[in-house]
């Protein structure tokens, strides 16, 4: 079985317009990504609890549906961060158990 080269014209702009040649900026490292995700999750959590407190004081400001959706978003964000942390710990332990 012969392996052929990938044709660069396959992903031309006229075939798939959303693929562009613009330079994509990537975050510098994993630490920055993880701390940014923690900060965003923390800020979102504070915002939703402020929204809950304000809705208890002023009944007409926020609907219960919006609050429940926001709580689910926060829950998913926290679960994701916990899973990432668990994978990091698992990877660290695996590396530490490697023999040199």
From Swiss-Prot:
Cellular compartment(s): Bacterial flagellum basal body
Cysteines engaged in disulfide bonds, as pairs: none
Primary residence: other
GO biological process, one term: bacterial-type flagellum-dependent cell motility
This protein's name: Flagellar hook-basal body complex protein FliE
UniProt KW keywords: Bacterial flagellum
InterPro entries, alphabetized: FliE (IPR001624)
Listed GO CC annotations: bacterial-type flagellum basal body
Entry GO MF terms: cytoskeletal motor activity; structural molecule activity
Family of this protein: Belongs to the FliE family.
Organism, scientific name: Buchnera aphidicola subsp. Baizongia pistaciae (strain Bp)
């Amino acid at each position: 079985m012969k392996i052929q080269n990938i044709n660069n014209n396959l992903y031309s702009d006229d075939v798939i317009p959303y693929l562009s040649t613009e330079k994509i900026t990537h975050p510098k490292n994993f630490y920055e990504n993880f701390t940014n995700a923690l900060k965003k999750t923390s800020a979102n959590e504070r915002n939703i609890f402020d929204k809950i407190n304000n809705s208890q004081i002023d009944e007409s400001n926020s609907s219960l549906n919006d609050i429940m959706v926001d709580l689910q978003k926060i829950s998913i964000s926290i679960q994701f961060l916990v899973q990432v942390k668990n994978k990091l710990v698992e990877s660290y332990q695996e590396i530490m158990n490697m023999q040199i």
